[in-house]
UniProtKB/Swiss-Prot annotation:
The keyword DNA repair applies. Zn(2+) 2 binds at residues 145, 179, 216, 261. NCBIfam families: nfo, PRK01060.1-4. Endonuclease IV plays a role in DNA repair. It cleaves phosphodiester bonds at apurinic or apyrimidinic (AP) sites, generating a 3'-hydroxyl group and a 5'-terminal sugar phosphate. One of its GO terms (biological process) is base-excision repair. The gene is nfo. It catalyses: Endonucleolytic cleavage to 5'-phosphooligonucleotide end-products. This is Probable endonuclease 4. Its EC number is 3.1.21.2. Zn(2+) 3 binds at residues 182, 229, 231. It comes from Chlorobaculum tepidum (strain ATCC 49652 / DSM 12025 / NBRC 103806 / TLS) (Chlorobium tepidum).
């Protein structure tokens, strides 16, 4: 089964995320576990944790279909000592929050060298950050999201993702989330079934399909290879609807979260229904 959902709001508490996902006909969802634009947040309460787990149970969401995202402030490749320690501490907290909620994955952007060090040094720093977080937690997989290639952010080439995974000690607790807009912006074509399949074969060759834990389904406002991260509603951007129809029929993409991050949240239920219209599910 294809597990399509969206990155839903946690307004009023994390326990509302599964309810918000259920309302739009989702079979998976993503969320933040706290305010993503602040370094510090109040700990999750026992009541919130219990309500979240109960709501997931009642709505039929299993942990493997939920892909929480960490704070945008975290940079696990930061070259400065004070900033990397702050980011690593925050990331461990994010992993612990996911663990407390009974979740098995945490999605993160790999990091940026800020033009202060070279790519490989930054990739080593990112991998060391992941290793430390895995040592400090149990049961949660760190899921690297590919990036669009903007600025000094790494993760826009499959080789970057492969290098991080190579350096992570516990290979059973690292994975990848492929964002379609980011793929397209960084130069990987998806516009036809043939182009999509070629890109997925390249991912399998360089990284390995066994590491694919989820996808973000977004069309792109800018052209192929633009390195501009601007999401568009499905079928209204430069990728086009054929790619997303193909994803829904692709046998390698079963039972992983396929998460919408398209600009119009009001249209998510319609987009989800449209995607399921490409299948018999």
């Amino acid at each position: 089964m294809k597990r399509v959902g969206a990155h839903v709001s946690i307004a009023g508490g994390v326990e509302n995320a599964p309810l918000n996902a259920q309302k739009i006909g989702a079979k998976a969802f993503a969320m933040f576990t706290r305010n993503q634009r602040q370094w510090h947040s109040a700990p999750l309460t026992a009541a919130s944790i219990e309500a979240f787990r109960r709501n997931c149970d009642e709505a039929g969401f299993l942990p493997e279909h939920i892909l929480p995202h960490d704070s945008y402030l975290i940079n696990l490749g930061a070259p400065e000592a004070d900033k990397i320690e702050k980011s690593r501490k925050a990331f461990v907290t994010e992993m612990q929050r996911a663990e407390a909620l009974g979740l098995t994955m945490l999605n993160f952007h790999p990091g940026s060298h800020l033009n202060l060090t070279d790519e490989d040094a930054c990739l080593k720093t990112i991998a060391e950050s992941v290793n430390r977080s895995l040592d400090a937690t149990a049961g949660v997989t760190a899921v690297i999201e590919n990036t669009a290639g903007q600025g000094s952010n790494l993760g826009w080439r499959f080789e970057h993702l492969a290098r991080i995974i190579e350096l992570v000690e516990d290979k059973s607790r690292v994975g990848v989330c492929l964002d379609t807009c980011h793929l397209f912006a960084s130069g990987y074509d998806l516009r036809t079934p043939e182009a999509f399949d070629a890109t997925l074969r390249e991912f399998d060759r360089v990284v390995g399909l066994l590491y694919l834990k989820g996808m973000h389904l977004n069309d792109a406002k800018q052209k192929l290879g633009s390195k501009v991260d601007r999401h568009e509603c499905l079928g209204k951007g430069m990728i086009g609807i054929d790619a997303f129809a193909h994803i829904m029929r692709h046998p390698a993409l079963e039972e992983i979260p396929l998460i919408l991050e398209t600009p119009n949240a009001e249209g998510w239920a319609e987009e989800i229904a449209m995607l399921y219209g490409f299948t018999n599910e």
